[in-house]
């Protein structure tokens, strides 16, 4: 493991509050195994956005064996289908084309909306189906990715490291730099982003 970043952000907005809980576990260059990403964005007591993925570190179209090893053989897509089958769930499409392109085909990207008066239903889903899916994907990552070591040529490793750095930097630009100032103001958001850049090992572009 290269580093782990856990964050919980709470922001009051005119019609309520937004809570964002994130967990990023990034692996180092001794392996090409996927990173682990989890993020929950709750904008109301009855709805939330769920993002879960084993974030690929290679171009999947160029490396079908990578898909087979980490996504097909592990049957991780079964976890996505559990959420997909919930009547309250609908696919979440990020407004960023970069974000959509960076994640795997098995990513759990859903909005769960339980409607008016659905606080209890959302809580049941979070503690039931969602908790089970999170545990399932994390266990797959721990079993298949966390302790994996990969033999790579030096040039291949350099490409992977560069890709990792680009994804980290672009993610900060697309997600945090664009949204945090509106939530917390320039001073607080600037300090948060600076610390995250430091953790991610990327410089301001």
Curated annotation (Swiss-Prot):
Places the protein is found: Plastid, Chloroplast stroma
Residues engaged in binding substrate: 39, 175
Keyword Metal-binding: no
Reaction catalysis annotation: primary fluorescent chlorophyll catabolite + 2 oxidized [2Fe-2S]-[ferredoxin] = red chlorophyll catabolite + 2 reduced [2Fe-2S]-[ferredoxin] + 3 H(+)
Record flagged with keyword Transferase: no
Keywords: Chlorophyll catabolism, Chloroplast, NADP, Oxidoreductase, Plastid
PTM comment text: The N-terminus is blocked.
Short name of one Pfam family: RCC_reductase
GO cellular component, one term: chloroplast stroma
Tissue-specificity statement: In etiolated and green primary leaves. Low amount in roots.
Protein name, UniProt field: Red chlorophyll catabolite reductase
Lineage of source species: Eukaryota, Viridiplantae, Streptophyta, Embryophyta, Tracheophyta
């Amino acid at each position: 493991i290269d580093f782990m970043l856990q964050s919980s952000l709470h922001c009051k907005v005119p019609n309520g509050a937004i809570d964002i809980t994130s967990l990023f576990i990034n692996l180092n260059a001794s392996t090409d195994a996927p990173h682990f990403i989890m993020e929950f964005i709750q904008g109301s007591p009855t709805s939330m956005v769920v993002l879960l993925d084993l974030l690929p570190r290679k171009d999947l179209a160029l490396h079908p064996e990578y898909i087979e090893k980490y996504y097909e053989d592990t049957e991780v897509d079964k976890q996505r289908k559990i959420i997909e089958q919930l009547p309250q769930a609908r696919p979440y499409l990020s407004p960023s084309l970069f974000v959509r392109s960076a994640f795997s085909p098995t990513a759990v990207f859903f909005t769960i909306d339980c409607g008016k008066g659905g606080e209890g239903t959302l809580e049941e889903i979070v503690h039931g189906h969602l908790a089970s899916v999170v545990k399932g994907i994390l266990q797959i990552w721990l079993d298949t990715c966390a302790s994996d070591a990969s033999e790579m040529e030096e040039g291949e490793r350099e490409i992977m490291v560069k890709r990792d750095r680009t994804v980290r930097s672009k993610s900060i630009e697309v997600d945090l730099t664009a949204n945090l100032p509106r939530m917390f103001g320039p001073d607080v958001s600037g300090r948060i982003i600076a610390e995250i850049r430091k953790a991610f090992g990327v410089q301001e572009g």
